Curated annotation (Swiss-Prot):
Name used for this protein in its record: Alanine--tRNA ligase
EC nos: 6.1.1.7
Gene source species: Deinococcus geothermalis (strain DSM 11300 / CIP 105573 / AG-3a)
Keywords tagged on the record: Aminoacyl-tRNA synthetase, ATP-binding, Cytoplasm, Ligase, Metal-binding, Nucleotide-binding, Protein biosynthesis, RNA-binding, tRNA-binding, Zinc
Cofactor note: Binds 1 zinc ion per subunit.
Record text about domains: Consists of three domains; the N-terminal catalytic domain, the editing domain and the C-terminal C-Ala domain. The editing domain removes incorrectly charged amino acids, while the C-Ala domain, along with tRNA(Ala), serves as a bridge to cooperatively bring together the editing and aminoacylation centers thus stimulating deacylation of misacylated tRNAs.
Superkingdom in the source lineage: Bacteria
GO molecular function: alanine-tRNA ligase activity; aminoacyl-tRNA deacylase activity; ATP binding; tRNA binding; zinc ion binding
Record-listed Zn(2+) binding positions: 574, 578, 685, 689
Amino acid sequence: MTGPLTTAEIREKFLSFFESKGHLRLPSHSLIAPDPTTLFTVAGMQPFKPQFMGAPAKFPGYGENRRVTTAQKCIRVGDIENVGRTRRHLSLFEMMGNFSFGDYFKREAILWAWEFLTSPEWLGMDPARMYVTIYEDDNEAFGYWTQDVGLPEDHIHRFGADENFWPADAPAKGPNGPCGPCSEIYYDRGPHYGDDTWADYAQTRESARFLEVWNLVFPQYDRQDGGVLADLPFKNIDTGMGLERVASVVQDVPDFYSNDVFRPLVEKVAELSGKPYEGEVSVSHRVVAEHIRSVAMTIADGVALSNTGRGYVIRKILRRASRHAYLLGLHEPTLYRLVPLVVQAMGGAYPELVTEEARVTAAIRAEEERFLKTLESGMQRLSGLLEGMERGAVLPGEEAFLLYDTYGFPLDLTKEIAEEYGISVNEAEYAESLERAQETARAASKYGKSELFGGSQEALEGLPPTQFVGYDELEAQGEVLALVGAGERLDHLMAGSEATVVLSRTPFYAEGGGEVGDTGVLEWEGGRGLVRDTRKTPAGIWLHDVLVEEGELTPGVTVRGVVSSERQAIQRHHTATHLLHAALRAVLGPGVRQAGSLVAPERLRFDFTHGAALTADELGQVERLVSRWVTANFPVTWREMPLAEAKAAGATALFGEKYGDTVRVVRVEGGIPFGDATVTSMELCGGAHVTRTGDIGAFVIVSDENVAAGVRRIEALAGEAATAWVRAQLNNVHRVSGLLNTSPDTLETRVIGLQSQLRAAQQETAQARRQLAEAQMGGASTQQVRELGGFKVAVLRLSGIEGGELRGAADKLLDQSGADLAVIASDKGLVVKASKTAVARGAHAGQLIGKLAAAGGGKGGGRPDMAQAGIGNPEAALAALDTAF
């Protein structure tokens, strides 16, 4: 080899090599999947699905070329639990690839792969240590490897379709569609990684010595019914080389975590935790190092931590890292301090990490703080479970998994805490629960070849793209091209039936860009149907969900589509959304980025990146800016233009969105002065809008809330919806004013006065309760001290005392009595207080109260020094003291 190249140098060499072979170098696509069937980009070829399906190899802003090379960042989470536990599983990885869309084929792919791997100019690997696998019937590849490359035959293994075909076992099991053999390239790392041979590997397919570094896929067949493999009219090349894999070979390190990207992260984790990277604890070092890279890069790509979709997956990854940091003794937010190391390692190839570093850091820190509080809640939950169990008992595995799934407790932490109580965990039950959850996760993230190359759209095959005229027309005629129900073509649709209707021409806007799909009616001679929703396929086919009310609908009939009047309300809210976006950027700064939206007839919802709640002044500024636009009654125009021209003109694009060569730009023809600047609105958008800002009518912000770490959500109303909301608020003010015998003008003063009176009454009540407790305690605390289990326990029964007064009474009783523990029972409450000396001797208030509360018909828990519970029978709880020690 030429020497220990860095990961960045390997990446650059790969891309430069294929540029020298006439390939177009393209940047990595966002981790947000370009295909709606998956959450994340999971394969290097995924962004090129249209080209593999025959679309022109045109790439806006970069040119046209049927040869492409990329280093694509990818995320796969189906086996997330293995990350860190093994040294070769990653959730985020870089897949370098070269692709041919009907250009070169097998020979060039094999020869160029060999040249890049073995030439001293490139990676310079030892040819004698190279091995390959091929599909058992692929004599063409065998010939290229042996005759053109010169690889010895005993360095080649043939395998069946289950190993060397893509998709696996496609000839026998399908799916129908493009498929083909593949050839995998392996490198022999030497005897210090194992004493197995290449022949051994052929039998076991497991080896630390023989490492796969590249997979060359040759999609050359069209799999048809009966397992027939027909030749494709054009043949493609799809290769994938894992950058982390090849880096471990080139740098001659034992695993991914020892390469130049992960090593600094692992070392920093060891430094922060004070625990060296060795032994069993090293799993946690690896989890933290790997996951922080995944989370940082995904947030930089625009994914907001949330409770659904992509945001939920990334939040789970971050919380897994936080759990392992906790196991390392890092009980304060720490992961965010690793972000600069990720930026240093990856920012050169992915500049969005550099520009988004501050936002990424803030989002991770906020989520850490939130999760650590949740972790504390989990500790209380676990303590409550364990305190009600006898020593030697077994904690159900389902409970352990719920702690993991709800509070983020890893099994190791649950076992460690349970051992302190002399309790074990049913790990078999835990494993069963975990496997069920993992099966669900794998199903959600599965990305097979049938999805990459279609396969479930048979009912729509052969249909042309729908002509959409709804920007200018709310009524239009079109021919019924197809009726689809339950995935099949229908020959008619009777009254009372519902199905999907495909038209040649439509005025109905299809759901997209946050805007809901249009509703309305279809009318034809002798019939009528309700359009309940409108969607579209990636191929541009409009899908109308139609319920036939009258008559019969058949293919070939000409219908008149009439869009509902709700469209006008949708247009008001959509244009208002653009103005809101521009106003937020003006008031809060250019770092504001759209993170999601909903445009509906009754409201708009806008999610955006911002680290703090908006002040009343900021909300007021935003609302006034939008209202000034409305009052100005500027024209709203749109036109189509090349993507490069739109970007040069300053049009706002949705981060991570994939655009074509030509884009639609919606512009408000006028700006609003704000400070030293003039605020304008121009966005790439395919939605429906008003023709003038004055058509919005009115605008009001009704809420601002946090929805995820670093993401805010504003809900607002426009037009009649805004007017109705304002009227409802005024009615509420008048009604409440009447109830309080005041006028709207003096309502605030009246409420402030009532609050002051309430606080004074609450203080008087608290004082009375304290006095009642002191009166009941009297001076007889020494007579209430009992000797139990080697501890002096002061016991007291009170009446009418609860909450904070009960805890205060326990503090006082412990001080007055000089006892080790104080136990006080009231009508509905129980409290146990232990002195520091007693805790040091093994006393545990939380464990004791668990037993007493159970006897008193309640439950509770707490810390070793203080615990509280709700009970129904205080006498029974106190009676249980004799057996509780």
